[in-house]
Regions:
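Conserved alpha/beta-hydrolase "acid-adjacent" motif
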Residues: 225-230, 284-285
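A domain-start/cap signature at the N-terminus of enzymes
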Residues: 1-58, 70-76, 84, 137, ...
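The conserved beta1-alpha1 loop
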Residues: 60-66, 170, 219, 277
């Protein structure tokens, strides 16, 4: 744990972020309703390209804090790539009633357990999309940025039987935090579970005994919001279940950036990690040139490499020279079939007690107000 002055500084910095930085008016996504009990109270957006092939793949895309589904899609280019290559995209969206800063609640115990909270809501959306549109259950993938990357880690840990692969961009390892102070400390690289505990947390998150998803990890070397040691923790967690050594099988340069690859006993690439030199907090893009995809903006960083294209290729979703002539437009949906597992009760979220009529004056009262104001602005307190 850091001292109180460090905590106040971090909270105050989050309070200064523009509320609408990640919002977008360019929205061609469709709405998904009636997908289940939705215990996490999330919104579901989706996109189907024209002439979608039978048994198409599904990519689940999770936005970061201060963003919404349309804004993250506009920046990352996932539906643009889906139109080009022929797969479906599901974009869960956080609501302000759950989190004032629109962060997925990646460390709240009631939201990150199998069959409860936000994790179950996303699972229900996936089931509804697969059943309604005849998608391929063997080709379901999940990716996300920051809090969305941490939530992607949650989904991969709690439902490894659902996903063929995942990609975590500037995210955090599953189970690395369960409280607000722990979340801030992990983001800054302070403390956290040991390598063996990270691997144990992953194994205990589900009853899964089969093959594990392939994992792609992306991190900016100059990220001070979610520091690079978090990528190391994610890698350590997944190296365990895949039976991999800490040292990579090979290292190489891709579009001028460092890539490490870990292969399984059959020689298949099962874990990869990109370190983007000099990049801060955000999703790496190539917004110009022959392979341009996405648009630069807040937390969407044009650094000359498209994480979206490379992730899709790692999953086997794309072929470099195959492009469909399609335009990203709204897709019309049909009635959705609810998914109803044995749902675990979600802990009631308790609002903070009202402030006293005469709050304490002096330094202590001032510190309390700064902390509470910043927590609310950061989406960590209601």
């Amino acid at each position: 744990m850091r001292d109180i002055s460090d905590t106040i500084a971090r909270l105050s910095a989050m309070r200064g972020r523009p509320a609408g930085a990640g919002q977008s008016k360019d929205d061609h996504l469709s709405e998904m309703t009636g997908f289940g009990s939705n215990p996490g109270a999330l919104r579901a957006r989706f996109y189907l390209p024209e002439n979608l092939p039978k048994q198409a793949a599904l990519v689940v895309v999770l936005h970061g804090c201060t963003q919404n589904a349309a804004a993250y899609d506009h920046g990352s280019g996932w539906t643009e790539l889906a139109a080009e290559q022929g797969f479906a995209v599901l974009l869960p969206e956080q609501q302000r009633a759950n989190n004032a800063n629109l962060c997925f609640n990646w460390f709240v115990p009631g939201d990150v357990s199998r069959d409860s909270g936000e994790a179950l809501s996303i699972r229900q959306m996936i089931e509804a999309a697969v059943v309604t549109h005849g998608l391929d259950r063997k080709r379901i993938f999940v990716t996300g940025l920051s809090a969305g990357g941490a939530m992607a880690a949650v989904m991969l840990a709690t439902y490894p039987d659902v996903f063929a692969g995942g990609a975590i961009i500037a995210g955090l390892a599953y189970g690395s935090a369960s409280t607000i102070p722990e979340a801030f400390d992990r983001m800054r690289g302070h403390g956290g579970p040991s390598r063996s505990d990270l691997q144990r947390l992953l194994r205990e998150a589900s009853p899964h005994k089969g093959a594990w998803p392939r994992i792609s990890v992306w991190q900016g070397s100059a990220d001070t919001t979610v520091v690079p040691s978090n990528a190391d923790a994610v890698l350590a967690q997944w190296q365990g279940v895949h039976g991999l050594a800490q040292a990579p099988t090979r290292t190489e340069k891709v579009d001028g950036q460092g890539r490490k690859v870990w292969c399984d006993g059959k020689g298949r690439d099962v874990v990869e990690a990109y370190s983007i030199a000099g990049m801060g907090h955000g999703t790496p893009l190539q917004a110009s040139g022959d392979n341009a995809l996405g648009k630069a903006g807040p937390f969407m960083l044009d650094v000359g490499i498209s994480s979206t294209r490379h992730i899709a290729r790692f999953w086997g979703l794309t072929k470099p020279d195959v492009r469909r002539a399609a335009k990203a437009e709204a897709a019309s949906g049909t009635a959705l079939q609810p998914f109803s597992p044995k749902e675990k009760p979600r802990a009631v979220r308790v609002d903070p007690a009202p402030e006293p009529v005469n709050p304490p004056s002096g330094p202590a009262g001032g510190i309390t107000k700064v902390i509470e104001d910043a927590l609310r602005a950061a989406g960590l307190m209601r």
